[in-house]
């Protein structure tokens, strides 16, 4: 009698499950804040919210308030602040779960990722209203913004350089490095505009998004790549 070979019912290896979870979280983190921004901006109709002119954090201000010559009164301020907070936590966990990082390389990535996560939490807890400048909480908001900008874009550059270790293609790795550099340059430009005094220029919102959105979109794509190829992250 010939023996029958039954299909394997063994569960996926823990490493595969962890890799898929890491990828899913790297999708969910950026998607959360992008979706919160889109919905909050759509709800702001009087006057219409401008992605080019208005600060991102305006969407998290209940208002009415004014800062840097911009009027702020966001109907869904709570949604945007939740998006900031959840982005930082979810994306950090996704990065921490990447199995391809070992030893010192892991900590080199975790440190700026921690700054990114702390930045998201601070942005969510301390909205950047005009009143925040007077009561001192605006300092926490500013620290959160720049910690998030700098930390996230350093993470992008590092993960791009370590692409082989975390299972990303050469193209995706290069994209991460490029968007990280764009983000850091945009952060410097944004800072220079803010400290120059007076009202901000009409494209300040676009400059700020240069520090955030290339990272968010590319990290989301990297997460999707990891979900499709979870085994590539498992070393040894």
Indicate where each model-derived feature is located.
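Short, Lys/Arg-rich, polar N-terminal cytosolic tail immediately upstream
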Residues: 1-18
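N-terminal signal-anchor transmembrane alpha helix
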Residues: 17-47
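Interfacial segments of alpha-helical transmembrane regions
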Residues: 19-28, 102-114, 168-179
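Extracytosolic (periplasmic/ER-lumenal) interhelical loops and adjacent juxtamembrane/interface segments
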Residues: 48-73
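Individual transmembrane alpha-helix segments
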Residues: 66-102
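Terminal transmembrane helical module of multi-pass membrane proteins
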Residues: 157-236
């Amino acid at each position: 009698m010939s023996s029958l070979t039954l299909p394997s019912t063994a569960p996926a290896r823990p490493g595969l499950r962890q890799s898929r979870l890491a990828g899913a979280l790297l999708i969910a983190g950026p998607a959360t804040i992008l979706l919160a921004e889109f919905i909050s901006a759509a709800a702001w109709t009087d006057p219409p919210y401008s992605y080019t002119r208005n600060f991102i954090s305006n969407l998290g201000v209940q208002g009415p308030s004014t800062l840097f010559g911009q009027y702020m009164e966001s109907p869904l301020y709570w949604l945007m602040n939740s998006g900031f907070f959840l982005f930082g936590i979810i994306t950090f966990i996704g990065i921490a779960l990447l199995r391809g990082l070992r030893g010192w390389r892991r900590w080199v990535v975790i440190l700026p990722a921690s700054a990114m996560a702390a930045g998201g939490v601070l942005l969510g807890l301390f909205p950047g209203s005009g009143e925040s400048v007077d009561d001192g909480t605006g300092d926490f908001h500013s620290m959160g913004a720049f910690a998030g900008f700098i930390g996230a874009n350093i993470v992008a550059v590092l993960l791009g350089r370590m692409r082989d270790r975390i299972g990303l293609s050469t193209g995706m790795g290069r994209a991460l490095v490029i968007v990280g550099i764009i983000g850091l340059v945009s952060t410097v430009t944004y800072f220079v505009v803010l400290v120059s005094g007076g009202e901000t220029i009409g494209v300040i919102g676009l400059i700020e998004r240069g520090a955030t959105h290339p990272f968010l979109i590319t990290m989301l794509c990297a997460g999707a790549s990891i979900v499709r190829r979870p085994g590539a992250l498992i070393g040894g």
